[in-house]
Amino acid sequence: MYSTNRTSQSLSRKPGRKHQLRSHRYVMPPSLHLSDSAAASVFRAVRLRGPVGRDVIAGSTSLSIATVNRQVIALLEAGLLRERADLAVSGAIGRPRVPVEVNHEPFVTLGIHIGARTTSIVATDLFGRTLDTVETPTPRNAAGAALTSLADSADRYLQRWRRRRALWVGVTLGGAVDSATGHVDHPRLGWRQAPVGPVLADALGLPVSVASHVDAMAGAELMLGMRRFAPSSSTSLYVYARETVGYALMIGGRVHCPASGPGTIAPLPVHSEMLGGTGQLESTVSDEAVLAAARRLRIIPGIASRTRTGGSATAITDLLRVARAGNQQAKELLAERARVLGGAVALLRDLLNPDEVVVGGQAFTEYPEAMEQVEAAFTAGSVLAPRDIRVTVFGNRVQEAGAGIVSLSGLYADPLGALRRSGALDARLQDTAPEALA
């Protein structure tokens, strides 16, 4: 396992939680939407605009000053917000004039992205910023043993965060996810009804939410992206491609999550002689398919042995390096994948006709030189009015962002309820009780 540190702090959850077991009721469906509840609206306004005064919060949320005051007081008492008296306007009288901001230092959430080859464990603050990431090979054994191994890795990682309280765990992965129970069918890993949520909830003693990785990435665009979405936002199509392909819809400020799980575009019919495949999208544009074509074309000597031992990321990096060095075959191969992807995005756009099209995943972001081919194929393949494609704001960190937002979604939808479920609110009340009696 190796670590990519984003902060010099080495912090961990509160001690004493390691052996605390939670029943399966601590598996919670993710809330991948912009909540319009008063507390959520106020917290979102402060998160996006803070430090900010209560009058500005009222103006941006359309809530009354009285409602804003009540919510701010509750969030201050819960420790999610803090006052900035040093920023108060000169001459202002009374606490409602004191700006507030998110009190992010005391808390952390844990995101886990279980990929086909690599699992990322991500520490996230209340702004949705990645504090630190570690990566470990995804266990290839049966679901029970694999989940036990992943839970042990996550538990060891949480022990680093001694000065912050862990609030929630968000898990993202491919396959068919039952978010209500946290069980997953993942054919590529050989998992059938794998109890992902229950195992992690029991092992970590924290609430756990499990989501389809593409739904989660779309949720990150909606809730953590640089753009300011409103709860009544229009429709966006999110298309993902890397080792797998997938799509998600954002409708009215909410990621559309069908009860039976996300749809699939893996068997979408495509054609590419250079990439081969079975005439289906995923088997044609996945990293594995591109590397298989590179082996056939003898672009990179020795690429076969590395990919068979799980080094596909390294092999793709080698292919990109060769293309950037001027190898014409490598450039044509990556351009062909871009062409096929652009045509597939055009087909989805014409079928669903969203107001916005967003693409993400390393098939789009690791080689931005090919985005011109993606856009050209998209324009040529669509029969509707011209529309731009927007690339994810998270670049090659989109999997981290997806896992992070699933770990934060409960807090963003119901800040006080999330603290209560995690046990943090009760602990804070116990900590402050002696002060109140003094």
From Swiss-Prot:
DNA-binding annotation, residue ranges on this chain: 52-73
Sequence ranges of Polar residues compositional bias: 1-12
Domain of life: Bacteria
Keyword line: Activator, DNA-binding, Repressor, Transcription, Transcription regulation
UniProt GO MF annotations: DNA binding
Consequence of gene disruption: Disruption of the gene reduces the expression of PE13 and PPE18. It allows mice to survive for significant longer, with substantially reduced lung pathology.
Pfam families: ROK
Region described as Disordered: spans on this chain: 1-22
Example of a GO biological process term: regulation of gene expression
Family: Belongs to the ROK (NagC/XylR) family.
Function according to Swiss-Prot or TrEMBL: Positively regulates the expression of PE13 and PPE18. Can also regulate expression of some other genes. Plays a role in modulation of innate immune responses.
Stated name of the protein: Transcriptional regulator Rv0485
Taxon lineage: Bacteria, Bacillati, Actinomycetota, Actinomycetes, Mycobacteriales
